[in-house]
Amino acid sequence: FTLPVENTLPEKLHETVYTVDYQDIRMITLNSNTSLEEQTPYLEKQLKESKAKWNILTCHHSVFSPAKGRDFEFARKNWKPLLDKYNVDLVLNGHDHTYARGHVPMTTTSSQGDDEITTVYVTSVSGPKQYEVDKDQMKAYEADGYTPDLTAEQTQFFHVITVENNTLTYVAYTAVGEEYDRAVIVKDFETGKKQLK
């Protein structure tokens, strides 16, 4: 099938870096395998110009990798500040052959609730190759503001994401259809504040 072509990007990124607007959702896809620096201005432009109520980013490599020895520092140092700045709702990743869902809380203020968040991050796996979760590495990401919520090993997943008005529901199912994980983001569109349920 044909994927969108962003003519402002080099040809080597065509059909691998693009944005799709669907109803109230802006889905931005980046190519985390090559030309990372060239994609950073594109990401900021897409987020800055977004009129969508929900912004979702997807790329292959994990911003917060749960697998031992796998770390995508470029994304944390260059893309995460943009995800924070523009209050991106959900980031979907793969690559690490393990499962992890976590979030970045909003910057602490005296009026902030404990469940207020900036972004939910998901790393998942659907194929047979599986790695172990590195709990020490997950703990180290706390310095970047990341809070791990749930991990899994030796399990294949698929996901269903639904959006209804001010609620985005993410559900992870095992390959045999059993629900493993659920995260519900409730968003106040006037303030931009989000709660994780």
Where are each of the predicted segments found?
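Flexible loop residues that form catalytic
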Residues: 60-62, 96, 166, 176
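Acidic, histidine-bearing metal-coordination/catalytic regions of metal-dependent phosphoesterases
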Residues: 154, 162-164, 169-197
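Extended active-site neighborhood of metal-dependent phosphoesterases/phosphodiesterases
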Residues: 1-51, 78, 100-152, 157-160, ...
